[in-house]
Amino acid sequence: MKDNIELAIFTPEKNIKIGEIKEVITEGLDGDLAILPNHVNMITYLKPTITKYIDLNGNKNNIFTSSGVLKVEDNKVYIICDASEKPEDIDIKRAENAKKRAEERLRNKKEIDVKRAELALFRSIARIKIKEL
């Protein structure tokens, strides 16, 4: 039995190797997921959210992850997503503007792809929330 898990996040632009940690908490399509050491192997879809992880010193950390896939295999957690940003890398003005645009598009549903606008709204809200933590 292992005491830790490894976390790595992959996006088209970058790979983020977090390394060994104690726990990962993120959000799948069916709700929150908590991954601890010795978790059963699995694959699931993820929503845009604030993914939380606890490092080996017990510090709580946050990182934005967009929609994607999470894979757990042999105490390794892989998140493959469209985008991932640490709080310090998020442009809050850009996120707020994206939120306003998405909300406006959703108000005018006749002219837009609703699913795409909803995802844009989820992404912008998660980016704003992570800056507020």
Swiss-Prot record:
KW Ligase (keyword) present: no
Highest rank taxon of the organism: Bacteria
Locations listed in the record: Cell membrane
Keyword terms, alphabetized: ATP synthesis, Cell membrane, CF(1), Hydrogen ion transport, Ion transport, Membrane, Transport
Membrane topology: Peripheral membrane protein
Gene3D superfamilies linked: ATP synthase delta/epsilon subunit, C-terminal domain, F0F1 ATP synthase delta/epsilon subunit, N-terminal
Main location, first listed in the record: membrane
Keyword hit for Membrane: yes
InterPro entries xrefs: ATP_F1_dsu/esu_C_sf, ATP_synth_F1_dsu/esu, ATP_synth_F1_dsu/esu_N, ATP_synth_F1_esu_C, ATPsynth_dsu/esu_N
Leader peptide range in chain numbering: none
Function per UniProt: Produces ATP from ADP in the presence of a proton gradient across the membrane.
Protein family (similarity comment): Belongs to the ATPase epsilon chain family.
Complex and partners: F-type ATPases have 2 components, CF(1) - the catalytic core - and CF(0) - the membrane proton channel. CF(1) has five subunits: alpha(3), beta(3), gamma(1), delta(1), epsilon(1). CF(0) has three main subunits: a, b and c.
Name of the molecule in the record: ATP synthase epsilon chain
Organism: Clostridium botulinum (strain Langeland / NCTC 10281 / Type F)
Gene: atpC
